[in-house]
Amino acid sequence: MRVKSSIASVVMLGMFLPISVYAQAELTGPVTHVRDGDTIEVGKIPIRLNGLTCDERGTALGDRATAYLRSQIMDKVATCSLNGERTYDRLVGRCATEELGDIGAHLIAQQLCGRCTRYDSAGIYEDAQKRAGRYAGAMPSYCRPI
């Protein structure tokens, strides 16, 4: 029941509290959908993986990243540390599973996604990107440091 109560708690928080409260929130639950390489759904809650960029679906690398991630984490339990930000309909955070560890670091190591420097100012994915080599995908302008 921990999974259901964790999801219910975050949903209830979202109804009554400002977005800034999510800064310390942790969400644990089953991965129910992989939208693309850098967006998953935990329960019905969409999470944008912070500090990561992946090519869009409809591109060769984007489709590979999405299919790979789907094969690795669907129905697995993910724990996401939310940072209090929101982009479109998604909360933003870093997620991990018992099987993969940090999902972003794993996707970088597989050379399917890259470090988005602007949103990884703490350098969490810096070593993973150095080990993986240069990201072969398209680096969006919003990933460059300000």
Regions found by a protein language model. Name each.
Residues 9-18:
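Bacterial N-terminal signal peptides
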Residues 2, 18-146:
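Small beta-barrel nucleic-acid-binding modules, primarily SNase/OB-fold domains
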Residues 1-10:
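Bacterial N-terminal signal peptides that target proteins for export
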